[in-house]
Every structure is written in C-alpha cells, then in structure tokens.
C-alpha cells in the first residue's frame, strides 16, 4: 500500500523530527560517556571557576548579549550587504518541529549542549591553551558559523560564537554558554511557533481601534 502525496508530505517532517531528536540524544549521551572517562577534559582553565549562582546569572545575561549582538549583526547585514532579515535554515527546522514536536528537544536542549561541547570546549578550549582568547574565539566562531550552512547570515552566527566563547572564558564554566545558547534557541523557537497567531492578534486589535 502506497501513501498518497499529501500523506507522504505530512509524514516527512514527522520522520525528520524523530530522526533529529533521537540522533542528537544518542550523540549527546555518547559525548557525556566519553568525556566522563577523562577527568582532565573540562579543566581547560587554571584557577578558581565562577560560582554556580554567578554562572547562572552570566548565562542569562549572555542570552541578552547574544540577542542584542544579533540585532547589531542583522543591522550590518542589511545596511552593508543588503541581506534581508529571517533565516531559511531556522524556518525549515521550525517547520520540522511543528510536524514533530519531539524535535524541539533537539533544537532547544540537545543541539545547544552538543554545539557547546564541540565549538567551545573542544575547538576554543584547545586553541585558547596554545594561542590566546581572540585567536581561539574567532576560529571557533567561524567554524560554528560554517556548520550551520546558512552562509547569508554567517555574520550573525559568528557574533553568537564570539559571545559564547566570551561567556565560557569569563566564568571558566561551559554551563554559562550552554545556558545562554539554550535560552536563545528556546526564544527563537517560541517566536517562530507563535509569530503567525501573534500577527493575526495584532491585526484584529488594529481593526477594533
């Protein structure tokens, strides 16, 4: 028995959503298992790390830093390069999440944690020990931007990568950048999910005035 065209189109996002969620979950679990065997893996910085409460505070502040950093980056993209706002990459991912809400876990939780492991701990953390903050931050941020395959907005991703690196460097705790990254992805997902209903609501308010 074959699916109809409509049924096939509806099934595709669901399949993709579950695949993304499960693959990210497995990758995260494997990463945690492998890194737990090396006690020195997280000891990138010498000296005292930031306290847990201040780590959380810096993580929340970091979200706002990234948010405003993206606003500045978007303004530069528009003014200098004529690039319009909005990301097709983000829109595609959110479309999958709407078809399979399980994918939200990958977008908001699993993905950010994995990306912080790879780009901040592995790439930035390795380079900062042999070079300096700026070299490590710029290189890791560029790789972070490239891996998203949204080259029209590479400046925005690079800015995010630089700020995440700063947060990790400032507090000496990877959880700081993870908190900021999770909050950013969660905020973007929430806005994308409710952008259309919110727009309709505002239009109705205008009609009532």
Feature map (PLM): residue ranges:
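Functionally important transmembrane alpha-helices
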Residues: 137, 141, 145, 152-209
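Alpha-helical transmembrane segments in multi-pass membrane proteins
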Residues: 1-38
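Hydrophobic, lipid-facing residues on alpha-helical transmembrane segments of integral membrane proteins
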Residues: 56-72, 76, 109, 113, ...
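Membrane-interface helix/loop boundary segments of multi-pass membrane proteins
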Residues: 114-139, 166-173
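Hydrophobic alpha-helical transmembrane segments
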Residues: 17, 21, 55-60, 101-105, ...
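Structural signal for the C-terminal ends of transmembrane alpha-helices
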Residues: 32-42, 167-171
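Active-site His/Glu-centered metal-binding helix of metallohydrolases
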Residues: 113-118, 122-123, 150, 183, ...
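Juxtamembrane helix-loop-helix connectors linking adjacent transmembrane helices
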Residues: 8-14, 41-111, 129, 197-209
């Amino acid at each position: 028995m074959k699916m109809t065209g409509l049924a096939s189109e509806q099934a595709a996002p669901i399949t993709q959503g579950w695949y993304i969620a499960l693959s990210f979950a497995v990758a995260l679990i494997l990463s945690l298992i492998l890194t737990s065997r090396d006690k020195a893996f997280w000891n990138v910085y010498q000296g005292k790390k930031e306290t847990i409460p201040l780590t959380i505070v810096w993580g929340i502040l970091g979200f706002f830093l990234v948010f405003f950093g993206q606003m500045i980056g978007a303004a530069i993209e528009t003014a200098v390069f004529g690039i319009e706002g909005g990301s097709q990459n983000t829109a595609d991912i959110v479309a999958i999440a709407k078809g399979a809400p399980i994918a939200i876990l990958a977008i908001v939780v699993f993905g950010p944690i994995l990306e912080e492991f790879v780009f901040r701990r592995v790439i930035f953390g390795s380079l900062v020990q042999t070079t300096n903050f700026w070299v490590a931050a710029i290189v890791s941020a560029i790789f972070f931007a490239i891996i998203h395959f949204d080259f029209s907005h590479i400046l925005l991703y690079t800015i995010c990568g630089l700020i995440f690196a700063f947060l990790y460097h400032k507090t000496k705790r990877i959880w700081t950048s993870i908190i900021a990254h999770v909050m950013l992805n969660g905020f973007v997902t929430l806005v994308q999910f409710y952008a259309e209903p919110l727009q309709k609501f505002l239009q109705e308010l205008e009609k009532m005035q």
